[in-house]
Amino acid sequence: MNIDKVFKALADPKRLSLLVRVAEERSPSTVSHLAKGSGVDLSVVSRHLAMLREAGVIKCEKHGKEVLYTLQTDVVVRTLRQLADALECCCAEKDL
């Protein structure tokens, strides 16, 4: 996992919103389901999902003709822990 890639993917508000939507679904979702009501074109949602997948925060599985997307909770949690640890080290050094 590349922490830089994760934060770069999450820096875009639409991708972050899409990640939250995937997390809220609690079950695998298709691109068309995730695009519904988002006001964003299906192809754009698909590109955003590809970037999130490349960053490792979501995974996709092909079932027949459909591709289903789910949150990689462990990756998100591990990334946030790495950030917290890095900040804790920085803050601890400043307190010395």
Q: Model-found features: residue ranges?
A:
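Amphipathic alpha-helical dimerization/coiled-coil segments
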Residues: 1-3, 24, 72-96
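N-terminal helix-turn-helix DNA-binding core of bacterial DNA-binding proteins
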Residues: 2-41, 63-75
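Short, hydrophobic-biased segments on the C-terminal half of alpha helices
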Residues: 49-50
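Glycine-centered, phosphate/nucleic-acid-interacting loop/turn motifs that mediate DNA/RNA or nucleotide
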Residues: 56
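Short beta-strand "wing" residues that participate in macromolecule-binding interfaces
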Residues: 60
